Amino acid sequence: MRKIRTKICGITTPEDALYAAHAGADALGLVFYPQSPRAIDIIKAQKIAAALPPFVSVVALFVNESAQNIRRILAEVPIHIIQFHGDEDDAFCRQFDRPYIKAIRVQTASDIRNAATRFPNAQALLFDAYHPSEYGGTGHRFDWTLLAEYSGKPWVLAGGLTPENVGEAVRITGAEAVDVSGGVEASKGKKDPAKVAAFIATANRLSR
């Protein structure tokens, strides 16, 4: 049986975290990128992590952050997986004693084709829409057909996903994991419980 894994990213409150977890999210993303409207600090992250039930993965998202600051956060917040969204290379990403996911901003098929070679130690790749100045969370999607024949390293689909289009996205790409942030929000940084539930329910229906 295939299960479509879901990650709800940009969680900013324990309430949003608990709702997503109870709705069936497999992972929750905490953004440690000060320029993001969904950024949180260590104190907030600790409160969110403490509220979660077992077996929900906590993912820390960084963008071109210093190794020193990443280690400080990892020492104070129970993080299971690191997700890198900046210009980090494999040597940088693999040094933190946590599995890591590397976001790839997709413009062409070669971005997808070359990603596994560039990040051989990644647990998974996350394919997101390219933007010249923003590192994810844009609400934009890329050409999903570029992934239709991809069979490399495990990967996650992101970029412009919503409860309305996640079914189509999975059917086109064959994704086994999906990541959403803005597509389930009431406003930036505040999740809409109904949208979160609908997104996860749709992903679950596609599991087989």
From Swiss-Prot:
Signal peptide boundaries: none
CDD domains: PRAI
Residue ranges of coiled coil: none
Catalytic reaction list: N-(5-phospho-beta-D-ribosyl)anthranilate = 1-(2-carboxyphenylamino)-1-deoxy-D-ribulose 5-phosphate
Pathway: Amino-acid biosynthesis; L-tryptophan biosynthesis; L-tryptophan from chorismate: step 3/5
UniProt xrefs under InterPro entries: Aldolase_TIM (IPR013785), PRAI_dom (IPR001240), RibuloseP-bd_barrel (IPR011060), TrpF_fam (IPR044643)
Alphabetic keyword roster: Amino-acid biosynthesis, Aromatic amino acid biosynthesis, Isomerase, Tryptophan biosynthesis
Molecular function via GO: phosphoribosylanthranilate isomerase activity
Family: Belongs to the TrpF family.
PANTHER family, per database record: N-(5'-PHOSPHORIBOSYL)ANTHRANILATE ISOMERASE
Protein name: N-(5'-phosphoribosyl)anthranilate isomerase
